[in-house]
């Protein structure tokens, strides 16, 4: 395993998650990370991701655009460089309320991350094919 990696964003695989939402995994277990994973998600105008929680702490920083963060039923306006820190088990989602893409950087405090959909209770591994459909 290499001591370091240089990731060229244009060469990384894009995960199409439905409704035009696309994610790119950055740091992950496959690169040798043992303590965190990260990636970038683009949410198109007018689209929301499903209400969900994770099994680990998550940081999200808005890289571009503006929208709404819904956390435990409370709604917060967010814009470029605003950052959330959400503990595991907390229901949350992001809604793009702008006319342009909402680009977020996500960082998890683990390489073994799951997503549990609030509506159904279904738990799936983060960024796997079982997560692609529209919840």
Provide a role label for each language-model segment.
Residues 24, 39-54:
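Conserved short histidine dyad/triad with adjacent acidic residue
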Residues 57-58, 62-67, 72:
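Glycine- and acidic-residue-biased ligand/ion/polar-headgroup-sensing regions
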Residues 50-51, 69-70, 86, 92-98:
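Short beta-strand His + acidic residue motifs that chelate non-heme Fe in jelly-roll/DSBH
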Residues 1-35, 119-135:
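A short, N-terminal "cap"/entry segment at the start of jelly-roll beta-barrel domains
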Residues 44-46, 81, 89, 99:
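Tight coil/turn sites that cap or link beta-strands
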Residues 59, 85, 100-115:
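A short hydrophobic beta-strand segment most commonly corresponding to one strand
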Residues 73-88:
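Short acidic-glycine-tyrosine-enriched beta hairpin
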Residues 31-34, 44-47, 66, 110-113:
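Short, charged/polar surface micro-motifs in flexible loops or helix N-caps
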């Amino acid at each position: 395993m290499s001591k370091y990696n240089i990731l060229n964003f244009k060469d990384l695989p894009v995960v199409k998650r439905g409704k035009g939402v696309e994610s790119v995994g950055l740091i992950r277990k496959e690169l040798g990370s043992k303590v965190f994973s990260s990636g970038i998600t683009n949410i198109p105008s007018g689209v929301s991701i499903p209400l969900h929680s994770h099994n680990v702490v998550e940081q999200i920083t808005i890289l571009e655009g503006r929208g709404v963060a819904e956390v435990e039923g409370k709604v917060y306006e967010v814009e470029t460089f605003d950052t959330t820190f959400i503990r595991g088990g907390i229901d949350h989602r992001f809604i793009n309320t702008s006319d342009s893409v909402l680009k977020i950087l996500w960082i998890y405090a683990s390489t073994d991350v799951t997503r549990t959909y609030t509506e159904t209770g279904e738990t799936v591994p983060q960024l796997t094919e079982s997560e692609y459909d529209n919840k």
